[in-house]
């Protein structure tokens, strides 16, 4: 099914300042999710980064509701007394009836207040509540599915809490309850079944069935309309989970997804079209000077180079100054995350670099947690050898420096033959002998429990990337989350990303994709796909994404082999860039971080909440969406320093300019390119803020004769807007060098 080309509900004219802000004086927001102070997946990042902008809007009327976990409370939560009498009475009432409810402050930016429900302490009511769920919603939950049973307990506790909170308030506030994912969806269904006066929102960050189907190697997007969803869910033994998710989507006043591609998926699998798309953002920390993040890149790259020196000892026959670091990171879903496509493209890239005699070397990291039992001995030995060589060099350097100093002190030139004695040469020879190894550097840094059947390792064996000296592409599989306390690669994830040159995320199923978004915020170019939410968002809002270091791989309309070829082209073009071109591109990439800031994207969540209030309390709130002309779409323009395509830039008559007479130092003529970084940055900042907001909806509330009016955004759901200027025929970096 082709994607719609009409104006998107997440179009960037929404970055304009609103005339009025929402006044939550008599409204309370509860955001309910399984990952509140409980890191499991990407929803944790959404809640953690969004907390500040939501707290700024709602103040002390904003609460997060999640499960109690001992580890999470011990490391992330400061337990407190409830700040209001109503909330204190609510918690006391639930605790007196056999529940365990905790209250505190989540120790993250913004410091939001959290209500934590102890699911395990309420297991005594599981069978009764499962029976009530069956009577109310006709959803049966098998005894062996612990995750689904926890979802039932969490849902009933959440509903109990919301009902008790309303009962303890004499002046009933307008309550908005925002539920994330199916694990919290039971609570939403029960709120509607019990007719609680609550405005409900359900956000799906990925559909259950979509994730399972894509992992099963089916042609997912071309068959969305043809799936028998009940049959597919039943065959995968997730029918009860699917029913929870679908019921929550249909019961909610407002249903949202995180991207246009997921909206299409939800419409066919969950049988409800999302009311609004709420893209995921990040907390963007801007640098006071343009060169600061470039310096951080150099420092982090030096840390990675130290690891590479140790890992490839004995085979370090490539120039580290001409080495590029690529990486892929995320959940270990081999096909969904595109690791299969990345490996195939690396094999083809290796062939291209070898046959063309390139001096560039590529080290590709795979950061995907898998089952291991220990570190690889060879990997540990490599870091020990590197440290030994460093200590030996420092010892010899100190002795050499001392003798040189003494010789110069007496006014004579040193005799170089006497600067080092026999003992020093022996020490250096022993260090050199220690670097000799008979085997290739290891591909995997750990010992895998299922080495023979691991998808990444079996593919590496098939394509033959064994880190040999002849290979221009080296592969390192790190099956563990990065940590600054690791004895192998002692860097955290953020520092690692800053030190790399390119993030590669050729996902087949990626509802949003925080990894390429994090790369963008840190000024690191990345490759995404038109099947990921992030890729669609960038393709929609940027006229020429590749000029800004955002490469969009076509996995929607191309075959798997063609997608591999396109990815290989992207990688090879990137390898051909000069260092100066990469620096300029990183500057452009970092400037796109404004597009991903919660200060802007958080407004789509505001819109969803206002829409829910209008539907739940129509006597007090109104929401009037305006129709939008699709021609009013806005796209972030190409950088002014990027030349247009040759067909558009050719002179109509023979013409010779002063620029043509300037010397061109390299084959690409890079040093003749006039480029003012500060001027470029100023233009891009104006481009973000300049567009006018083409659609408005009023959301007014009346309480006791007073009215509040707020402007919120809405619009028809779609995918890609119409470009405002012609695009060049190609999207690779080759265009930038023409």
Swiss-Prot record:
UDP binds at residues 39, 331, 515. Primed phosphorylation at Ser-657 (site 5) by CSNK2A1 and CSNK2A2 is required for inhibitory phosphorylation at Ser-641 (site 3a), Ser-645 (site 3b), Ser-649 (site 3c) and Ser-653 (site 4) by GSK3A an GSK3B. Phosphorylated at Ser-641 by PASK, leading to inactivation; phosphorylation by PASK is inhibited by glycogen. Phosphorylated at Ser-641 by DYRK2, leading to inactivation. Dephosphorylation at Ser-641 and Ser-645 by PP1 activates the enzyme. Phosphorylation at Ser-8 by AMPK inactivates the enzyme activity. Keywords: Allosteric enzyme, Glycogen biosynthesis, Glycosyltransferase, Phosphoprotein, Transferase. Pathway: Glycan biosynthesis; glycogen biosynthesis. InterPro entries: Glycogen_synth. It catalyses: [(1->4)-alpha-D-glucosyl](n) + UDP-alpha-D-glucose = [(1->4)-alpha-D-glucosyl](n+1) + UDP + H(+). Alpha-D-glucose 6-phosphate binds at residues 291-292, 294, 297, 301, 501, 582, 586. Glycogen synthase participates in the glycogen biosynthetic process along with glycogenin and glycogen branching enzyme. Extends the primer composed of a few glucose units formed by glycogenin by adding new glucose units to it. In this context, glycogen synthase transfers the glycosyl residue from UDP-Glc to the non-reducing end of alpha-1,4-glucan. Part of the GYS1-GYG1 complex, a heterooctamer composed of a tetramer of GYS1 and 2 dimers of GYG1, where each GYS1 protomer binds to one GYG1 subunit (via GYG1 C-terminus); the GYS1 tetramer may dissociate from GYG1 dimers to continue glycogen polymerization on its own. This is Glycogen [starch] synthase, muscle. The gene is Gys1.
